[in-house]
């Protein structure tokens, strides 16, 4: 069974906040800048890197108290479908890192909540999680699938 996550975009800081459902009372959200290059060293990642969450294909920095280096996971199937009539998620996120106009924060948040995470939770697709890096994360992956090229053309 797939782990359940809360997902919320914070437009004030332009970060994606993630945390396991049920952690509201004890944990802080896992968050990180969209597309920012990481300047922290891999040694800054805590030894408790969240293996208890049973997530596959996530880098250890995803569980760091400082948050992940960048937005970096989705369902393989969803990455290949359109987010709207004209653009796919990697291109949208890449444009956001460049400061270009894309879908609104509200629309992007709705996409994650209603599409990606719903399928992940209800269909148990965690084994299909892939890692897509916006920026230069230096962290190795936990039980990672074969590497993917984030900017592969559609």
Curated annotation (Swiss-Prot):
Keywords: Activation of host NF-kappa-B by virus, Activator, Apoptosis, Host cytoplasm, Host G2/M cell cycle arrest by virus, Host mitochondrion, Host nucleus, Host-virus interaction, Modulation of host cell cycle by virus, Transcription, Transcription regulation. Residues 31-43 have a biased composition (Low complexity). It is found in: Host cytoplasm; Host nucleus; Host mitochondrion. Signal peptide: none annotated. Residues 68-117 are annotated as: Mitochondrial targeting sequence. A fraction may be phosphorylated in insect cells and HepG2 cells, a human hepatoblastoma cell line. Phosphorylated in vitro by host protein kinase C or mitogen-activated protein kinase. N-acetylated in insect cells. GO terms for biological process: DNA-templated transcription; symbiont-mediated activation of host NF-kappaB cascade; symbiont-mediated arrest of host cell cycle during G2/M transition; viral genome replication. It comes from the Viruses. Residues 26-45 are annotated as: Disordered. One of its GO terms (cellular component) is host cell nucleus. Pfam families: X. The keyword Oxidoreductase does not apply. Multifunctional protein that plays a role in silencing host antiviral defenses and promoting viral transcription. Does not seem to be essential for HBV infection. May be directly involved in development of cirrhosis and liver cancer (hepatocellular carcinoma). Most of cytosolic activities involve modulation of cytosolic calcium. The effect on apoptosis is controversial depending on the cell types in which the studies have been conducted. May induce apoptosis by localizing in mitochondria and causing loss of mitochondrial membrane potential. Belongs to the orthohepadnavirus protein X family. May form homodimer. May interact with host CEBPA, CFLAR, CREB1, DDB1, E4F1, HBXIP, HSPD1/HSP60, NFKBIA, POLR2E and SMAD4. Interacts with host SMC5-SMC6 complex and induces its degradation. Interacts with host TRPC4AP; leading to prevent ubiquitination of TRPC4AP. Interacts with host PLSCR1; this interaction promotes ubiquitination and degradation of HBx and impairs HBx-mediated cell proliferation. HAMAP family: HBV_X. This is Protein X. The gene is X.
